[in-house]
Amino acid sequence: MIFVTGTDTGIGKTYVSAILGKILKEKGINVGYMKPVESGGIEDTAYVRSELGLNNSFEELNPVNLKKPLSPNISAKIEEKEIDILKIKAAFEKLKEEYEFLIVEGAGGVAVPIKKDFLIADLIKYLDLTCIVVSRPNLGTINHTILTVDFLRKKGITVLGVIINCITDVSKVPYYEETFKSIEEFGNVEIIGIVNDKKDFYIDLKKLNLP
């Protein structure tokens, strides 16, 4: 099992989750997916559900769904909903029993609040998962990636590596190789994958504690 988090919203966690899931399926692994909390509709869950051909209901895969495209704590407040962490845990345990390998995707970045005194990073810790961090290749990513990795480690969470999702064409990013080296050197973390698109990617599966 693995938790897919990222340096920001819109960084490509859903896209990378789907690609990773399809790779594992092609290797004969019975892989499932879960997005514990989704704000702004059901689009992310629906996309990965479709890509992986999962038969689970949306509620099973996404136990907390909020309509407003805001931080979960704010969206829940506006919608007058109480986010039940035990409900998330129960859904997680059920899917964990059903699948050989489970990909759990976060919402936004690691410091996004789910509810009072409970961040995305706290959810990763609560579910006792290791994680990968999805990042971008362009200017600013060194800072964002290192801060994210450091925050997770201070919470006692193991970071297996970073996957660069090229939301900007990497060939148009000046000195991107030096950027990636800096992430690894100063963040003391390995870049285990680079995703250009659905057909052009590399992910080092040996780093993911596969069954």
Curated annotation (Swiss-Prot):
Pathway listed: Cofactor biosynthesis; biotin biosynthesis; biotin from 7,8-diaminononanoate: step 1/2
One annotated GO biological process: biotin biosynthetic process
GO terms under cellular component: cytosol
Keyword Ligase annotated: yes
EC class of the enzyme, as a word: ligase
Highest taxon above the source species: Archaea
Reaction equation(s) it catalyzes: (7R,8S)-7,8-diammoniononanoate + CO2 + ATP = (4R,5S)-dethiobiotin + ADP + phosphate + 3 H(+)
Xref: CDD domains: DTBS
Main location: cytoplasm
GO molecular function term, any single one: magnesium ion binding
Binding site for Mg(2+): T14, D44, E105
Cited function: Catalyzes a mechanistically unusual reaction, the ATP-dependent insertion of CO2 between the N7 and N8 nitrogen atoms of 7,8-diaminopelargonic acid (DAPA, also called 7,8-diammoniononanoate) to form a ureido ring.
Subunit structure: Homodimer.
Record-linked NCBIfam families: bioD
Protein name per UniProt: ATP-dependent dethiobiotin synthetase BioD
The organism of origin for this protein: Methanococcus vannielii (strain ATCC 35089 / DSM 1224 / JCM 13029 / OCM 148 / SB)
Lineage: Archaea, Methanobacteriati, Methanobacteriota, Methanomada group, Methanococci
